[in-house]
Regions:
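Ser/Thr/Gly/Pro-rich low-complexity, disordered linker/stalk segments of secreted
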Residues: 1-46
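Oxyanion-hole/transition-state-stabilizing segment in secreted/luminal serine hydrolases
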Residues: 142-182, 203-205
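N-terminal carbohydrate-binding/catalytic regions of secreted carbohydrate-active enzymes
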Residues: 51-156, 294, 298-300, 304-306
């Protein structure tokens, strides 16, 4: 037999030198050859993702979410979402999506009153003026933010015992204590291990990568880094709204798909007729649809990923 000896002059039972690293099918992985799953054993490219930024907020990514993953989210998740007008972009986008293409009305159906219905994603949608992280950041007597205390009270109610996903949105993120937001979120994560708390950044204000303390950009940087470092789920409003559909970065964008004199979302719509859906998106021009379209795509990506972890 023509076998290759290892450094000790012996071979294993398969005729392979003992100093090679071989998977169970006899395929070397450490040298860049894929195993039976197509992923090298020492490769990190398959690490789980937790952040829904601009790269996830596209129809291509959305349509590639397996139907089984969507159904898993509908079967497993009971979501509570607290927000005011800017936060409504998630729900508005999800509602508009149902009228987009054949089958979307069924596959991506959801409730908003917190009453579970078979075949629909269960969401308790708490939408009212001032019901957001920006307004309710005041620190109360126990040392926690108002929104935190309201969350604890909400979860203590017997009728909310099934809630296993919860998130709050910002209104204008500028000028607020974003580290306190992170700290209070982490306290909730510690105290309610069976609930997935989803972080959010706020919309851009057209002031670019402002170095001003607690600007929208600084909030984005701080919150995103925390989520990336700690495997926390995040819907990154700032990231989504400062990127065009082709991935071009517009750091000076506002919350309406406009950077200076460039209406990059409307321009994309003009050149891509039929590739977006209508919705009444808060704080945008009536005919600018992509801001809420992208929130729907990002949200469904998040829901599917959370269900995968449940």
């Amino acid at each position: 037999n023509n076998v290759t000896p290892d450094q000790n002059g012996t071979t294993d039972e398969n005729g392979q030198p003992d100093d090679t690293t071989v998977d169970e099918n006899g395929v070397n992985d450490e040298n860049g050859v894929n195993d039976e799953n197509g992923i090298p054993d020492d490769d990190t490219s398959a690490e789980k993702e937790f952040v829904a930024g601009y790269e996830k907020a596209t129809e291509d990514v959305f349509r590639n979410i397996p139907e089984s993953a969507i159904n898993s989210a509908k079967n497993k998740l009971h979501i509570a979402y607290f927000h005011s007008s800017h936060g409504s972009r998630v729900i508005t986008g999800m509602q508009g999506l149902k009228n987009y293409k054949d089958g979307d009305d069924t596959l991506y159906d959801f409730t908003t009153n917190g009453t579970p219905v078979a075949g629909k994603l269960d969401i308790y949608d708490e939408y009212e003026g001032g019901n957001d992280l920006s307004v309710k950041e005041v620190v109360e007597g126990n040392g926690y933010s108002q929104w935190y205390n309201e969350t604890v009270a909400f979860l203590a109610e017997a009728g909310n015992s099934d809630i296993n996903v919860l998130m709050w949105s910002w209104c204008n993120p500028d000028g607020h204590n974003h580290q306190k937001y992170i700290d209070d979120m982490e306290k909730l994560i510690t105290d309610y291990p069976d609930i997935t708390f989803v972080f959010m950044t706020g919309h851009p204000n057209g002031d670019g990568e402002s170095e001003t303390e607690n600007s929208a950009y600084q909030a984005h940087k701080l919150i995103r880094k925390h989520c990336e470092d700690n495997d926390r789920f995040l819907i990154d409003y700032w990231d989504i709204e400062t990127h065009g559909m082709e991935g071009i970065y517009y750091p000076n964008a506002n919350d309406n798909g406009v950077s200076g004199s460039t209406e990059f979302y409307k321009a994309w719509q003009t050149s891509h007729p039929g590739e977006f859906f209508e919705n009444s998106c808060a704080h945008t021009d009536e005919d600018q649809e992509l801001t809420c379209n992208r929130k729907a795509y990002a949200a469904w990506w998040i829901w599917a990923r959370i269900a995968e972890e449940k």
